[in-house]
């Protein structure tokens, strides 16, 4: 059974090779998890193998970890997001599902319950959702907050490296011994005909994008609805979400990123960014070079002089008029020096809470 000395390693193994099941050996010691009936119950695609076959499936496994069995909750609602779908915190449904999963991990009474629940959930849930929720929980739980959490790029390099370079990396990993591998040069396929290519190095910089991902780990939007929680659970949720100076740091962080972006633009003979106008065309094009192998999709490009259009999807509806209204309300709140909370009580922004309140409301609740 897992002991305090190897809990850290076992949690780290849950993040490794996210598209391979837990009973496949991972890590330098070729360690696999020993599965049980509870695991197969929530992972029916492996049920045909049976417990004994799963636990002897990988002949290269040198160590088999047996996790203490504990009751596990239902993941039925969270399973609505398929494993092969993209995950984004800017989609309300995804955010809600992430909140529910964070709640599950956060409310586990001890490390045994957390490890077993995470092991069972890992191979049935969307890998990006699982990584996000477990990382948020581990960063904020008192018994795991001191554990080093692996970075997103270590286990999802396809989000940060183009497919060509990733294919070369896989070839080296499979065919060449670790001591004989050579660095892979990531070439920039750019053209002078598109001015936006001059700043590709900044927009798709690994550090900048990792910072954005990590920001949402440290400052998550929140968990599921508070109505069904006990008073203690509500207070615990507030400790995760309502951190001191969160709104102020949100504003400062974005101000600094824009300042650096404008600096890079000036260094590349480009003008500073213009104020966003929801009704006008955007002059510059944008052609991202990255995608994601799991979904087989590339990020959508933006052609020159493109205008904002309504988005009407089954699970994600956004209308330009609505966005413009929210933007106008933010400006109005700033100009009037007050905002109206849910109880319709004016709250002046003359206090220290001013920037905190504004920065806290802007990310997900502009209205």
Positions of predicted regions on the chain:
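C-terminal accessory segments of proteins
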Residues: 2-367
């Amino acid at each position: 059974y897992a002991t305090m000395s190897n809990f850290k390693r076992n949690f780290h193994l849950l993040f490794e090779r996210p598209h391979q099941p837990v009973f496949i050996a991972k890590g330098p010691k070729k360690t696999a998890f020993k599965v049980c009936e509870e695991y197969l119950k929530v992972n029916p695609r492996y049920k045909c193998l049976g417990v004994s076959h799963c636990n002897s499936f990988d002949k290269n496994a040198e160590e088999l970890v047996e996790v203490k069995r504990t009751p596990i909750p239902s993941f039925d609602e969270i399973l609505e997001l398929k494993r092969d779908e993209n995950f984004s915190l800017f989609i309300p449904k995804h955010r809600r599902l992430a909140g529910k999963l964070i709640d599950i991990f956060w409310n586990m009474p001890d490390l045994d319950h957390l490890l077993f629940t995470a092991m069972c959930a890992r191979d049935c849930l969307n890998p990006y959702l699982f990584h996000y929720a477990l990382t948020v929980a581990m960063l904020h739980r008192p018994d795991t907050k001191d554990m080093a959490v692996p970075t997103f790029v270590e286990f999802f390099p396809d989000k940060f490296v183009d497919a060509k370079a990733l294919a070369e990396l896989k070839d080296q990993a499979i065919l060449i011994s670790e001591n004989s591998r050579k660095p892979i040069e990531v070439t920039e396929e750019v053209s002078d005909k598109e001015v936006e290519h001059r700043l590709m190095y900044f927009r798709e910089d690994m550090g900048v994008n990792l910072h954005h991902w990590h920001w949402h780990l440290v400052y998550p939007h929140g968990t599921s609805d508070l109505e069904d929680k006990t008073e203690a659970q509500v207070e615990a949720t507030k400790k995760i979400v309502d951190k001191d100076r969160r709104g102020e740091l949100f504003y400062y962080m974005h101000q600094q990123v824009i300042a650096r972006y404008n600096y890079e633009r000036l260094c590349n003979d480009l003008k500073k960014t213009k104020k966003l106008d929801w009704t006008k065309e955007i002059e510059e094009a944008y052609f991202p070079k990255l995608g994601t192998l799991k979904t087989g999709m590339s990020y959508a490009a933006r052609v020159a002089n493109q205008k904002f259009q309504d988005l009407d999807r089954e699970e994600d509806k956004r209308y330009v008029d609505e966005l413009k209204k929210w933007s106008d309300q933010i400006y109005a709140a700033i100009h009037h020096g007050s905002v109206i909370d849910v109880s319709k009580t004016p709250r002046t922004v003359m206090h220290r809470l001013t920037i905190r309140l504004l920065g806290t409301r802007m990310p997900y609740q502009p209205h």
